[in-house]
Amino acid sequence: MAFLRITSPHLKGPARTTAIMQWVILATVPGLLTMTWFFGWGTLINVVLASLTAVAAEAFVLTLRKRPLAFYLRDYSAVLTGVLLGLALPPYAPWWVTFVGTAFAIIFAKQIYGGLGNNPFNPAMVGYALLLVSFPVAMTTNWATPRPLAEIPGFLEAFARIFWNADIGVDGYTMATPLDTYKHEIVAGTAETVFALPVFGARTALGWEWVNLAFLAGGLLLIWRKIITWHIPVSMLAALALCSLLLGWDEDKYAPLQLHLLAGATMLGAFFIATDPVSAATSKLGKLYYGAGVGILTYLIRTWGNYPDAVAFAVLLMNFAAPFLDYYTQPRTYGHRKARRGVKQD
């Protein structure tokens, strides 16, 4: 029997780290552009500033460690950390907030463990959690009013606000997030009165629904390109939706399903943050448990905790559990019996 002979290469190797990071950064562009349209130039400025800070901080540590800069910086992992943290920050947060959070993320959440591939926690979320706990005022009073409700500041105005704390008009940039607004307003009102507020449109968070749909589109691109798998995003969103349906059926007490899915950092967290290949679970079953845990914790912290958008803390808590999940969910190796976990084999 004759076999066809084809040209090499015959085996397809794994994607390079640089290409993976570049695809993830590219997939954030729809969400970044949507946020810029609805909330102004602040987010774009934050992303650029955070990316530059991340590269500078990584170069600083690599120099101290006497490692080649070009080899390590070209993987774009530092840039991705800056992009994700910049997207998570309030659009008009002071420049030093972005600088401190990004530098801490790179130095103390990534490089101190040995660099890419060794960090047990998501660096961007470590930086975000540090900022939220240390500087709560700066992290909660610089959210922007969406475009339909206020005139969006121009680039120079946004730049002046971020770097020189210039006054650009209180109504132009100061407001609480929709999740925070709903959680506090529902205490003294009903769902109908809360949804009548200007920040809510068609019973969703005005502007934020399009932001989340844009990040969803970027996440689907990553799945299509096989940069990530479906396990973590689907299990996280399914768990969040299930908790909302089972525990949040009374809209006069708890935020409804559509707010949990289409407000805040839900889609950004599901497709770009929770799927971090280093700090997340790696086995297929482990990813399902991991994503479900992130979704459940997100709902619990949003509903009964002090931080309405709880994705960062949910991801960090599940980072603790990732090694445990991987240990107990590894598939059986072909040709071997599955050993009992925790029992020494003779």
Curated annotation (Swiss-Prot):
Name assigned to this protein: Ion-translocating oxidoreductase complex subunit D
Top enzyme category: translocase
Membrane topology category: Multi-pass membrane protein
Record GO cellular component, one term: plasma membrane
Localization per record: Cell inner membrane
PANTHER family hit by this protein: ELECTRON TRANSPORT COMPLEX PROTEIN RNFD (PTHR30578), ION-TRANSLOCATING OXIDOREDUCTASE COMPLEX SUBUNIT D (PTHR30578:SF0)
A Pfam family the protein falls into: NQR2_RnfD_RnfE
Record bears the keyword Magnesium: no
Domain of life, per lineage: Bacteria
Primary role: Part of a membrane-bound complex that couples electron transfer with translocation of ions across the membrane.
Record's keyword terms, sorted: Cell inner membrane, Cell membrane, Electron transport, Flavoprotein, FMN, Membrane, Phosphoprotein, Translocase, Transmembrane, Transmembrane helix, Transport
GO BP terms in the entry: electron transport chain; transmembrane transport
Cofactor(s) this protein requires: FMN
Keyword Phosphoprotein: yes
Binding partners and assembly: The complex is composed of six subunits: RnfA, RnfB, RnfC, RnfD, RnfE and RnfG.
